[in-house]
Amino acid sequence: MAAQTAASEAPAPAAAPADSPTTAGPTPDSVGRDLVAENMIKDYVLAAVAASIVPVPLFDIAAVVAIELRMIQKLSELYGKPFSESLGRSVIASLAGGVVGYGAGMAVAVSLTKLIPGVGWMLGMVSLPVIAGATTYAIGRVFVKHYENGGDIFNLSADAMRAYYKQQFEKGKALAAKVKARKEAAAVDDVAAAH
């Protein structure tokens, strides 16, 4: 009986007045979605780094583009936005092709070095995984930012996002280098365990 009395006398939680302004900022749903998006991007960076290690020239780039398209599709689903594969390819080409020194031409050139016996494959293995991972990371971050600002794939301007892409590309290089180092360390551990 005392428990019933205490429960009935407990103050009700204060409700916000109907005319009070809502607090701007992230909601629990948007914070959760942001975490899912960030983890999703990192998973696709890992896949892009792995795909770029394939020793077949140009197949590696095709695989990375396919991975990036799948990432864009999944981010579009996460944010409830429409997806178009042809527009996705166009945005990838516009963003990745526009970064001086690390554009699509650079990736193709690095991929083609795998044709050179011995040293060519090593050159490709050193630089392409970082380029592939950084590009994937930057593309993912561009789409997340654009979607969070209310945009969709149909109104994404690569020119307007180029500076942000370059900034995220630099962050992506660091992330991809870490992923590559972990994969190499795991490979060494596997070899050591086999002997």
Swiss-Prot record:
Write out the transmembrane intervals.
Answer: 45-65, 90-110, 115-135
Its Gene Ontology cellular component terms are: magnetosome membrane
Asked if the record carries the keyword GTP-binding, the reply is no
Q: Map out region (Disordered) in residue numbers.
A: 1-31
Membrane topology term reads: Multi-pass membrane protein
Composition bias (Low complexity) maps to 1-28
Keyword Cell division listed? no
State the UniProt keywords alphabetically: Biomineralization, Magnetosome, Membrane, Transmembrane, Transmembrane helix
Q: Where in the cell is it found?
A: Magnetosome membrane
Q: What else is known?
A: This bacteria makes up to 60 cubo-octahedral magnetosomes of about 45 nm in diameter which contain membrane-bound crystals of magnetite (Fe(3)O(4)). Does not seem to have an ortholog in most other magnetotactic bacteria.
* Name of the protein described by the UniProt record: Magnetosome membrane protein 22
What does the record give as the organism's lineage? Bacteria, Pseudomonadati, Pseudomonadota, Alphaproteobacteria, Rhodospirillales
Gene of this entry: mm22
